[in-house]
A protein has these predicted regions:
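Phosphate-binding site recognition
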Residues: 1-183
Length: 183
């Protein structure tokens, strides 16, 4: 019997638990026809995390063996795009950053999220990259991209950033922080 999902934001988990799912995979085809940079502007609790999770499984080169199981009975199962399971997916999740305290604390938390995303990426694909967590987040990303490029792989990175709005809204709500970041 199908279950009603509650607080499930991981696509694979939702499918394995046999939960109801409103198929939104037909949008993948449409999104691929758009620009390379996509931003989803929807209110909180509107399914962005689940949608980006579904995108992650669809585009992830490591999910190729699970495609039939995860996407049967969906639009994209019968109409796959040429980008199906064709990327190394790098995902950042900025949820949970605390905006109380000073700017240095927030920047440290932001850098931790970047570092954790990079570590997850390297672990998932078994890349033995050296990333210095004490560097600025931009330098960590630059290091990752340089090392990735040096491998001369045929597949590219697909970047997914979740809860980017949580991070920016937190800064916008604090006028002192906002002033610091726009200088």
């Amino acid at each position: 019997m199908k279950r009603i999902p509650y607080r499930i934001s991981d696509y694979e988990n939702l499918i394995r638990k046999n939960c109801y799912y409103v198929d939104k995979t037909m949008y993948l085809e449409k999104l691929e026809d758009l620009d390379n940079t996509l931003v989803f502007l929807r209110p909180r609790r509107f399914g962005k995390t689940l949608f980006t999770s579904m995108m992650s499984y669809y585009y992830d080169i490591n999910s190729k063996d699970k495609f039939d199981e995860l996407f049967k009975d969906t639009y994209v199962y019968d109409n796959p795009t040429c980008n199906k399971n064709n990327y190394y997916v790098l995902k950042f999740d900025f949820s949970g950053i605390s905006y109380s305290g000073d700017a240095e604390k927030i920047e440290r938390q932001f850098s931790e999220k970047i570092y954790n995303g990079i570590c997850d990426f390297c672990g998932k694909y078994k890349f033995n990259f050296e990333i210095d967590e004490n560097k600025e987040s931009s330098m960590m990303l630059l290091s990752l991209l340089r090392q990735f490029k040096s491998l001369f792989l045929d597949n590219k990175i697909y970047l997914i950033i979740d809860e980017y709005d949580d991070f920016t809204n937190g800064i916008l709500k604090n006028s002192e922080l906002f002033k610091k970041y726009i200088k």
